[in-house]
Regions:
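Catalytic phosphate/metal-binding cores of nucleic-acid and nucleotide-processing enzymes, i.e., regions
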Residues: 1-96
Length: 96
């Protein structure tokens, strides 16, 4: 099976998180789960970081936006990453 554009972004995010020694989990969405939860839930040097992966010009859903906003409100960091912003993720992790 060929890798989807989003799966390629997720693969690169995993590589970056590993490079920085981050803990991460990737919740699996199911009909019984909590829809809209970000693709990656991470702990980087004691800081909570959620990452929503998108490919190309993919947009977040209203439910994903709600989760990202709730994470910010609770004091965590939440970012959306695509192919063009992988370098920004590395810079963010380096700054923590």
């Amino acid at each position: 099976m060929a890798a989807t554009p989003e799966s390629k972004v997720k693969k690169r995010i995993k590589e970056i998180l590993t490079k920085f020694g981050a803990y991460y989990a990737m919740p699996i969405g199911t009909s019984f789960g909590n829809s809209g939860v970000p693709d990656f839930l991470c702990c980087v040097k004691g800081r909570f970081l959620a990452i929503e992966a998108k490919a190309g010009k993919g947009k977040t859903t209203a439910l994903q936006d709600k989760h990202l906003c709730s994470i910010h409100t609770a004091g965590g960091m939440a970012v959306i990453v695509n192919e063009d912003t992988l370098d920004s993720l590395e810079k963010l992790l380096a700054s923590i």
